[in-house]
Amino acid sequence: MELVTGGELFDRIVAKGSYTEKDASHLIRQVLHAVSFMHENGVVHRDLKPENLLYYNQDEDSKIMVSDFGLSKTEDSGVMETACGTPGYVAPEVLQQKPYGKAVDVWSIGVIAYILLCGYPPFYDESDANLFAQIIKGEYEFDAPYWDQISDSGKEDEFFLLHAHFSISLRTCST
């Protein structure tokens, strides 16, 4: 275990508002690398969110570390069906109480990437029932002016993370 002193990604998002595509891509690559390592070792986090991504130190270019494995599960412990995670970051199949696997972490990374790029979550409602319905339907927008500066390829990458997570392995998207 290591002591990390750089604070949460959440706090940096609040301070910055949003990230450039280049900076967001750098952060997401780090998260994908860490999660790929976890998945290769049979661990599914199940609660990835900016509050659980910590900066190693205060440096602007500090590496990101994954924390809070309280809801994580090993794949060899059986089929995962437990509804768990943080509401805005949880994958549709979890909400639908279907069996799930590693792809739920990819979904959460897609939500985090969306927030990094525009400063707000793709799914939001005061009512959990309405929020969950949005997530299950995949209802989100690339609202102007927040997404005006994001390239088409950036939007395509975001779409890929939020829609293709069901049938992909993390290895295919860790570029």
Task: Please identify what each model-predicted range represents.
Residues 81-93:
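Conserved activation segment of eukaryotic-like protein kinases, specifically the C-terminal portion
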Residues 27-28:
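Activation segment signature within eukaryotic-like protein kinase domains
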Residues 118-121:
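Structural helix C-cap motif within protein kinase domains
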Residues 39-56:
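Catalytic-loop of the protein kinase fold
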Residues 105:
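Conserved catalytic-loop aspartate of Hanks-type protein kinases
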Residues 2-8, 12:
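Conserved short submotifs of the Hanks-type protein kinase catalytic core
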